[in-house]
Amino acid sequence: MSKKALGVHSEAGKLHKVMVCSPGLAHLRLTPNNCDELLFDDVIWVSQAKRDHFDFMTKMRERGIEVVEMHNLLEETVRDPQALKWILDRKITPNSVGLGLQGEVRSFIEGLEPRRIAEFLIGGVSGADLAKHKDSEAAKMFNAYLGESSFIFPPLPNTQFTRDTTCWIYGGVTLNPMYWPARRQETLLTSAIYKFHPDFAGEQFEIWYGDPDQDHGAATLEGGDVMPIGNGTVLIGMGERTSHQAIGQVARALFAKGAAQRVVVAGLGKSRAAMHLDTVFSFCDRDLVTIFPEVANSIVPFSLRPDESRPGGIDVRREDKSFLDVVAESLNLPKLRVVETGGDAYEAEREQWDDGNNVVCLEPGVVVGYDRNTYTNTLLRKAGVEVITISASELGRGRGGGHCMTCPIIRDPIDY
């Protein structure tokens, strides 16, 4: 376990510990018929995706980063009977699997080895899985009506994008209520890891927002929109998947503990290509960002600051500067260095779609990005950034790059 305290204090400081999730059973269950509802654009070649993801983990480890993988964390978590009970009490309910199958599904999961439990919690349980375990009348009826390939509870292939389900902001974490139903069960699993796993249980950290036992309604939050950039400031995108209802509550919690003095809200349009702030804007160095200008230059910035005289204890102001200028000013910088998506208009649009601006910073001036974004990678290198590349051919089919596929847990501050 890392000796440094849990917490993320910048976007570009030295990364010490990060959580990722390798492709697995959930991805083996993607088909042309179900991938759209599971938020993937296509099926993937899973064995190749696993090799590419292992290469991603290896390249981070070569930089001295502790990389923890979600299947492994979950396996170690469910070895604790109390942790397994906590998960199953919330995941296998009459509302989720039905009264007739509740006991059988629970019996099936409890009868597995911890590694297989982790695989099925992420990979889902099908009618065929249950039939192999116990060919009961309830299972027969389910399979006769819906078919053995139907899911009693569905796979969670988007766990590959660990950035979104929880996000560490300074000395605490949010347990994010996700926008799409296909992703909402992911947060339960990461919450269990933080509650029971030895790396986290007993450690001191705040829960800024979120509770898997609550229905948050319209107050949705996803980590791809959240960036603790340092100097007491947090950037939060407000677009397709993160709502103002959630942003206000996160800001209030941060202000109440003095963890932040300002939240800069980035008003985004709602689109699949720009589903999160980090798909059009990410840090590559202490003062350098890469952006997709077509979207980033149209962001409407607002600033939230603590003010007990205002409704909810928050002062909300629309900024009269551009988003990039507001970010620079919040970090006491005269200006940000900016690398735009590379190529002509067609090439830039393709590279943004392929996560050219969605890079993860390992330390100041060192990022990991996809190999296929050659124009943008070349511009970053010309700006002095070391770009470590990984294969995009399979990992990118869920629309997420290096930033999306990482949940930083310990990251150093940067002195601004």
UniProtKB/Swiss-Prot annotation:
Q: Where in the cell is it found?
A: Cytoplasm
Keyword Hydrolase: yes or no? yes
| Superkingdom of this protein's organism | Bacteria
What top-level class of enzyme does the UniProt entry assign? Answer: hydrolase
For this UniProt record, give its keywords in alphabetical order, as a comma-separated list: Arginine metabolism, Cytoplasm, Hydrolase
Q: Where is the signal peptide?
A: none
Q: In which pathway does it act?
A: Amino-acid degradation; L-arginine degradation via ADI pathway; carbamoyl phosphate from L-arginine: step 1/2
| InterPro entries reported in the protein's UniProt record | Arg_deiminase
Q: Which GO terms describe its biological process?
A: arginine catabolic process to ornithine; arginine deiminase pathway
Q: Which Pfam families match?
A: ADI
| Record-stated family | Belongs to the arginine deiminase family.
What is the protein name given in its UniProt record? Arginine deiminase
Print the organism lineage: Bacteria, Pseudomonadati, Pseudomonadota, Gammaproteobacteria, Pseudomonadales
